[in-house]
Amino acid sequence: MADLIVGIQWGDEGKGKVVDALAGEYDYVVRYQGGHNAGHTIVVDSKKIALHLLPSGILYERCKNVIGNGVVINLEQLLNESKAFGNLQGRLFISDRAHIILPYHEILDIAKEKSRQSAAIGTTGKGIGPCYGDKVSRNGVRLMDLKNLDKLREKVDSIYQHIQYVQTLYNVELPSVQSVMEHIESIAPQILPFVTDTTQLLWAAQNRGEKILCEGAQGSMLDIDHGTYPFVTSSTTIASGACSGSGLAPRDIARVIGVAKAYCTRVGNGMFPTQEDGEIGERLRQAGGEFGTTTGRARRCGWFDAVAVRYACRLNGCESLSIMKLDVLDGFERVKVCVGYEYEGKQIDYIPTDYDNVKPIYREFVGWDKTCGVRTFNALPSQAQHYIKELEKIIGVKISMVSTSPERDDMIMLG
């Protein structure tokens, strides 16, 4: 059976730390969607380790790590990231069905974003959307294509016949087919030894009774179907994406663990009802180090949105919830939680499709002094204990972990 870690907000929730805390119990850790727009940061002995494509299980020698078919891969990024961990042969497996982000995807991503002007999505400009677009239009390049570079050249040449209009439409210059192929040919020999049919690999692992942990990227509120559209990512970020992005069946998923911060953040544009633009937002940003792992952009910050978290937990079928960065709220006299919205003159406790026009209804809690570094629930200040217990009641999902600092060992396990 497989367990699943999924983000419950707009990404950057701390999924990497949760995976790191649990990965030692598993034989396989699987990334199943997204690309190098994801950024999982783990702190080991005060040293930050940032992962963009590699599964977080890479930090455990016994873990085998799988990049599934639902991931879109920048080959150069993957190669550079892998080098930092030495010889990964036998520990890293990449799906031959995963799609490749090619140089022109990044150019298209940036050009399209600029053309949107005031309606810009806030994309990372990493080529993720255009790559998924080619996948859906059945015009993409997969890892399996690296095995026959002559046929791949023909495919890239054919793709270019369909995208030449882009140069005029967006006033950009695309790299030549020759330069794209040279780029691929220089990297392919170093990537191919890791490429395999990972679906068969995972099925075989299941038959042997081995334990699998699936690791989501981004967050549920960025899901292409159920997120704050159009300000979303291009993949299925909720639990169902773990099946389509890995080859596992729905019945193979034993439990889903949601991950949320004790407050909310968002990168890029789009709806964010509890955002605080002033002193509170800046205090959360600085205390939480809220700057993107991938882009370095300052994250928008605000109070915990229990309505959004409850919605996302229901979408994912969460058995439990991990609350991260509780320590960032240390020292606040009052802590707010959004428990409902004002919408069209009424009070509601759900997320409408017209999410841009809601106003948060808050419940206030008495703040606390210090939780940083605390590792047992009873050692938390009584006000912080009350906050966690009330979140559990409001959301209706058991809270099983609470993080109290960036350090990997500062985690309260509640069973």
UniProtKB/Swiss-Prot annotation:
It is an enzyme of class 6 (ligase). GO terms for cellular component: cytoplasm. IMP binds at residues 12-15, 37-40, 124, 138, 218, 233, 297. GTP binds at residues 11-17, 39-41, 299, 325-327, 403-405. Its cofactor is Mg(2+). Substrate binds at residues 293-299. It is found in: Cytoplasm. PANTHER family: ADENYLOSUCCINATE SYNTHETASE. Homodimer. Plays an important role in the de novo pathway of purine nucleotide biosynthesis. Catalyzes the first committed step in the biosynthesis of AMP from IMP. This is Adenylosuccinate synthetase. The lineage of its organism: Bacteria, Pseudomonadati, Campylobacterota, Epsilonproteobacteria, Campylobacterales. The gene is purA.
